[in-house]
C-alpha cells in the first residue's frame, strides 16, 4: 500500500516512476501530459489537496489522510462525512447506493423475536409505518424488520402447503393425479395402507429367509442328519436317471456283503483278531432296525419339517468305533451325489497277522488268504477272490500269477466281487447248494495249489544244489 503522505507536499510532481506506481491501483494510465487533463469540476472540488490520490479517485469526496485505502473510498458517499463513518467501521445497516460492503449477519435476541412473532400473528404484511415503529421499539433497522417479515411469510407458506413429516422428501403440494387434480382423501389413505402392508410383507420375507439360512447351517453341522443317503429327492430331472441305477446296484452289493457275513459266522470261528473287525464293519453296512435303502428313497427332503421332527438315529458311527481302521474316503459328494459309478461291491480291509497254513485253509471260505510259511522267508500273496459260478478257473489263474510276485505289504485286501448280481426271487435252498459247491471247489484248488508249491520249492532246492556242485 502506498503512503499518501508523499503526495501532500505542494511541490510534488507526477514523474514517470510515480505514474507507474499510481497505475498499479488506478485503472487509468497516467503520464506527464495527462496530469491536468482530468475534468475541471473534479479539480475544483478537490482544491484543498489537488494532487492527492483521494482527490483524483474521488472527485466528489474531499481528501483525507485518515482513509488510507483509495479503492475502498472510490465513489463512496455523497459528502465527505461518509468516509469518516467508513473509517470507524460504519453502520452495518446503513445502505449506501454506491458502496458494496458486505453486511454482517444480524443476531436477534429472544425478546426481539417474541415481539416480531406477536406482530406477525397480527398481520403478515405490515406497512412501512408499523415496521418503523417496531424498529424503533426493538432497537433495529427498518430494513432488517422488513427482511424478517419476508422470511417469516415464506416459512408460513411452506408449512401450510406441505404435509411432510421429518425425514420425508420435501414436496410443496398435496399428492395429485396425473391430470393435476387433487386426490381423494380416501384414495390417499388406501395407498398409505397398501404401502404399510407391502413393507410388513417385505420384513416377514426377510425374517423367514434369515431363519431358513440359519436352519440350513445347523443341519450341515449335525452328524446325524440324513444327508448321507445316496440320492436326494430335490435333484434336477437331468441327474435323477444317473443316480437311480447306481443306487440299486449299491443296494444289491450291500445285501451280498451281508449274506457273506452270515455264511462266515456259521462257517468257522478261527482268526479271532480279524473276526470282530469284520462283524463291526458289516454291521455298519447291513441295514439295522428295519431301515432299508428303499425307505431312504421314499423319505422326503432332509430339510423338510417331517424329517426335522422325526427321531432318527445317526447312520454313521463315531470315529471311536473305527479307531484302529485307517481313514476312509467318503463316497458321497457335497451335493449328495455319488462321485463315480460303482461297478463292484464295497471292499473292506482285513489286517493280516502271522497265521498258520491250517488256519488259512480252515478260514478260506470267507477270507481267501494264503500264507507261504517256508524256512527261508515268508511271503504275503495278494490275490483276488471272485465269488461266482466260475470261481475255480479264476482261482487257478490267480495262483499261477501270484507265485511269481515279490513279497509285498503285510496286510492283504480281499475284495468280493459279484459280476452277476443275484436275483431276489432265488430260493434259499438253491443258494446254499451253490455256496457249498463253491466252497468244495475252492478247498480242492487250494490243496492242489499247496502240492504244487511244495514241488516247486523242492525243484528250486535241487537246482541250487546242482549249482553248488559245479
From Swiss-Prot:
MF-aspect GO terms: DNA-binding transcription factor activity, RNA polymerase II-specific; sequence-specific double-stranded DNA binding
DNA-binding residues: 101-160
Transcription in keyword set: yes
Protein name per its UniProtKB record: Homeobox protein unc-4 homolog
Subcellular location: Nucleus
UniProt-listed GO biological process terms: cell differentiation; nervous system development; regulation of gene expression
Extra remark: Marker of antero-posterior subdivisions of the somite.
PROSITE patterns in UniProt: HOMEOBOX_1 (PS00027), HOMEOBOX_2 (PS50071)
Comp. bias intervals (Basic and acidic residues): 252-262
Family under the similarity heading: Belongs to the paired homeobox family. Unc-4 subfamily.
Polar residues composition-biased segments: 224-246, 355-381, 401-422, 430-448
Keyword match Nucleus: yes
Pfam families for the chain: Homeodomain
Purpose: Transcription factor involved in somitogenesis and neurogenesis.
Chief location of this protein within or outside the cell: nucleus
Family annotation (InterPro entries): HD, Homeobox_CS, Homeodomain-like_sf
SUPFAM superfamilies referenced in this protein's UniProt entry, alphabetically: Homeodomain-like
Keywords: Developmental protein, Differentiation, DNA-binding, Homeobox, Neurogenesis, Nucleus, Transcription, Transcription regulation
A single GO cellular-component term on record: nucleus
Gene expressing this chain: uncx
